[in-house]
Amino acid sequence: MQLQPAGTGSMASAVAAALVSWGFLDYKTEKYVMTRNCWVGISQRLLQLGVVVYVIGWALLAKKGYQEWDMDPQISVITKLKGVSVTQVKELEKRLWDVADFVRPSQGENVFFLVTNFLVTPAQVQGRCPEHPSVPLANCWADEDCPEGEMGTYSHGIKTGQCVAFNGTHRTCEIWSWCPVESSAVPRKPLLAQAKNFTLFIKNTVTFNKFNFSRTNALDTWDNTYFKYCLYDSLSSPYCPVFRIGDLVAMTGGDFEDLALLGGAVGINIHWDCNLDTKGSDCSPQYSFQLQERGYNFRTANYWWAASGVESRSLLKLYGIRFDILVTGQAGKFALIPTAITVGTGAAWLGMVTFLCDLLLLYVDREAGFYWRTKYEEARAPKATTNSA
């Protein structure tokens, strides 16, 4: 007969009693109780209806939760401007402007500049000449007003220390600069006003690599003359990406004459929203136009060496319209994984509805105590009894 260490049985009993008191050895199973509670029942059905409408109407249909998406397409943009204009100014006499003159840069890109007005200062050479009176701190009465070597922020050159006559009414500081200095008198009307009748051709191609799908905004046609005569119209010619400049500016809410005088910036947005479940038939560009800012100009010069061996230049201050083309896009196609995720999310929300209704029934309802006792009860198996002989 083996002897057990003292206290082993009592320790095991104590551990078992503790586990029972903590409920560690209890097993819980669900109990379904049919309750005749109208307001909780109505709340449950309304919440379930809301979940079903959200999942089917919004998540699946409106947001296309059954589709896999590609929101980073490869983008290609090619632009071409067509038109000819003639200007008649004293400094340049009669001059013809074509695409090579009024478009910067000459290669079509998604950002380009169309010249609509200009200010020319011909035959400049480096030397001494009076500063323009419109420049701050340029006007003077004596040489003391023109410190030698001083160069202002808006000055055209470096002061020589002399105060000289600019014309019959103004005296200004003499400067070392490209002479004569540029005038600040902008033409009252845009010199290239014919630019409003120029046409802009935008060819945009988007490629969604995830779906091996590509689409262009230009009509696929064998007629080589089609794009020479068509103009864009959202209803009659949606696949003719040829825009008249005047119409394009008008679609931004601006006026071409005002914008052409001192320049500005126009944004052209092209957005692709493609549903590839329809084999690409529901994939067309949407255009929008914004006037981004008013006032845009920059300077450029043509240099040459005169017969006397002196370097000369003609300075052009160009005003015009800067066009910024921004292309965005997304494409969706049916896939099992996003569909399963959307449906699974809806099922989880339906489970949350049951949980919320239980809270209403067991904690908020006036008969919460009764429902609590009915739903939760403790079940013990009857103890077996033995009769002694």
Swiss-Prot record:
Positions bearing Phosphotyrosine: 66
PROSITE patterns tied to this protein: P2X_RECEPTOR
Keyword Iron: no
Pfam families, per database record: P2X_receptor
Transmembrane residue ranges: 42-62, 336-356
Topological type in the membrane: Multi-pass membrane protein
Extracellular side: 63-335
GO cellular component, one term: endoplasmic reticulum membrane
UniProt xrefs under InterPro entries: P2X6_purnocptor, P2X_extracellular_dom_sf, P2X_purnocptor, P2X_RECEPTOR_CS
Gene3D superfamilies: atp-gated p2x4 ion channel (1.10.287.940), atp-gated p2x4 ion channel domain (2.60.490.10)
Disulfide bonds: 129-179, 140-163, 146-173, 230-240, 274-283
Residues bearing carbohydrate: 167, 197, 212
PTM (free text): N-glycosylated. N-linked glycosylation can affect trafficking to the membrane and function.
Major location category of this protein: membrane
Cytoplasmic side: 1-41, 357-389
Keyword terms: Cell membrane, Disulfide bond, Endoplasmic reticulum, Glycoprotein, Ion channel, Ion transport, Ligand-gated ion channel, Membrane, Nucleus, Phosphoprotein, Receptor, Transmembrane, Transmembrane helix, Transport
Keyword DNA-binding: no
Catalytic reactions of this protein: Ca(2+)(in) = Ca(2+)(out)
Gene Ontology BP annotations: calcium ion transmembrane transport; response to ATP
Superkingdom, taxonomy of origin: Eukaryota
Function: Acts as a modulatory subunit rather than a functional channel. Unlike other P2XRs members, P2RX6 does not seem to form functional homotrimers. P2RX6 requires the presence of P2RX4 or P2RX2 to become functional at the cell surface. P2RX6 can be translocated to the nucleus and functions as a nuclear regulator of post-transcriptional modifications in neurons.
Entry domain remark: An uncharged region within the N terminus of the P2RX6 subunit inhibits its assembly and exit from the endoplasmic reticulum. The P2RX6 subunit lacks nine residues in the left flipper, a flexible loop structure, which is a key element in the activation of P2RXs.
Subunit composition and interactions: Monomer. Unlike P2RXs, P2RX6 does not seem to form homotrimers. Forms heterotrimer with P2RX2. Forms heterotrimer with P2RX4; functional differences between homomeric P2RX4 and P2RX4/6 heterotrimer are minor. Forms a P2RX2/P2RX4/P2RX6 heterotrimer. Interacts with SF3A1; resulting in a reduction of the splicing activity.
Protein's UniProt name: P2X purinoceptor 6
Protein species of origin: Rattus norvegicus (Rat)
Upper lineage: Eukaryota, Metazoa, Chordata, Craniata, Vertebrata
